[in-house]
Amino acid sequence: MSKAPLALLSVSDKSNIVEFAQGLIQAGFGLLSTGGTFRLLTEHNVAVTEVSDYTGFPEMMDGRVKTLHPKIHGGILGRRGTDDMVMSEHAIERIDLVVVNLYPFAETIARSDVTMNDAIENIDIGGPTMVRSAAKNHAHVGIVTDPADYTRVLEALGDSTALTATLRYDLAVKAFEHTAQYDGMIANFLGSRVNESQEPESFSRTFNVQLEKVQDLRYGENPHQKAAFYVENNSSKSKQASIATAKQLQGKALSYNNIADTDAALECVKAFSTPACVIVKHANPCGVAVDIDQVAAYRTAFSTDPESSFGGIIAFNRPLTLAAATAIIDNQFVEVIIAPSVEDGVLEATASKKNVRVLVCGDLPAPELRDRQLDYKRVNGGLLVQEQDLGLITAHDLKIVTDVQPTEAQIADLLFSWNVAKYVKSNAIVYAKGQRTIGVGAGQMSRVNSARIAAIKAEHAGLATEGAVMASDAFFPFRDGIDNAAEVGIAAIIQPGGSMRDDETIAAANEHGIAMVFTGMRHFRH
């Protein structure tokens, strides 16, 4: 066995491991390895010793026991200058670098046909033990858990076998983050199957989520609040386009409120399968329009509420065209524009407004294919967790409850306004006509007052409510909302239904000759 310092390599993700191993040998390391990693290295003629040959103890129990041996953990945990004598007495050589990533538990449990046995057999034991041992002894040992760190480790080594204390500490923290994430996934998976049948429940006994800080923010919702932006990194699903995956192409750093509002705008525009534009202010849509012509979609959305759109967030569900980008910056002050991608020339056009932040998020999934993520709401001393509201309604789901039948055009507008209402803070009322918003009433304690505000907004923008449709995110508790709609000329209404007074609201709609449909689905948003 070479007296060169040792590096132990045992990885499930074998990306670039051969090149990394070759670099370690060039830096002066001798290599130990196990199982599949050992076989891969030997196939590429990399000089490496199998761990079982080093320990004199064979792998056993179908690979369950490979590295759990004093010669391995003593070599990792031994304190240089303190434990040298006992290491020498037991022929334990120093292991100065540990390169380990863990069994693919996340990928295993993401399979639709995963069994409990599959999951159990993909719970790594030896790997986390080595990772934690090396991270604990980071004063003397380097630990690498991420293939993305291979290059910087080789660059830091140069022609030596010593990493700086700063780098070892950073890698150790990353290693503990790695094992915490791993154990959290295991606890979530097993904790949601504590019933007799071991069938998955919606929520596990304990809730673990790993978040990674991507940005320190200047301040929070208000200047006296400190803040940072974290993103989830323990999702077993492929990450669909979101504010967390978006890339900023231009403009100054995003603020706390920018991120929150951009999320609201992007999630709303995702609800549309046809080309759409959404303008958001203070997390509420203030203008939404669907149009194959992106410039027309923007101008129409803007015209719903020009005052509120000032300094707003604009989201598109199609690539941002040069014409639309130019129309925006020539027309208004905007904080953020986000789209799946941008066409050539867009950044040159928006560069004239250096404070405009331009983000791309990647292709958006069809509304019916969106991943159902979890929503969190912090309460004092706890966390409310629920499934994301991705409930979809089609024309076939509508229950017509009035004598007057809605026309095909009205049904299209009802479904459009229903999509918008889902993203307006409750109590939410949306007036729409011709696949565009006419007025939005948001966040009122009284539903009828939200309806009044929607009408006021429409009048203020010079938009006619006569013949428009109305969407309500929850049922009308009294007929006053219907009477108010009739006063401004609303022709059709969409609402969940389910009130004790549904008969009264249906009667009111019939009195006024208004078509009304029930969805059977509520969309409170707080």
From Swiss-Prot:
Disulfide-linked positions: none
Pfam families: AICARFT_IMPCHas, MGS
Annotated domain remarks: The IMP cyclohydrolase activity resides in the N-terminal region.
Pathway: Purine metabolism; IMP biosynthesis via de novo pathway; 5-formamido-1-(5-phospho-D-ribosyl)imidazole-4-carboxamide from 5-amino-1-(5-phospho-D-ribosyl)imidazole-4-carboxamide (10-formyl THF route): step 1/1; Purine metabolism; IMP biosynthesis via de novo pathway; IMP from 5-formamido-1-(5-phospho-D-ribosyl)imidazole-4-carboxamide: step 1/1
InterPro entries assigned to the protein according to its UniProt record, in alphabetical order: AICAR_Tfase_dup_dom_sf, Cytidine_deaminase-like, MGS-like_dom, MGS-like_dom_sf, PurH-like
Alphabetized GO MF terms: IMP cyclohydrolase activity; phosphoribosylaminoimidazolecarboxamide formyltransferase activity
Species assigned in the record: Psychrobacter arcticus (strain DSM 17307 / VKM B-2377 / 273-4)
GO biological process: 'de novo' IMP biosynthetic process
Reaction catalyzed: (6R)-10-formyltetrahydrofolate + 5-amino-1-(5-phospho-beta-D-ribosyl)imidazole-4-carboxamide = 5-formamido-1-(5-phospho-D-ribosyl)imidazole-4-carboxamide + (6S)-5,6,7,8-tetrahydrofolate; IMP + H2O = 5-formamido-1-(5-phospho-D-ribosyl)imidazole-4-carboxamide
PROSITE patterns: MGS
Residues in MGS-like domain copies: 1-145
Family: Belongs to the PurH family.
Keyword Transferase applies: yes
Any GO CC annotation of this UniProt entry: cytosol
Name of the protein: Bifunctional purine biosynthesis protein PurH
Keyword Ubl conjugation applies: no
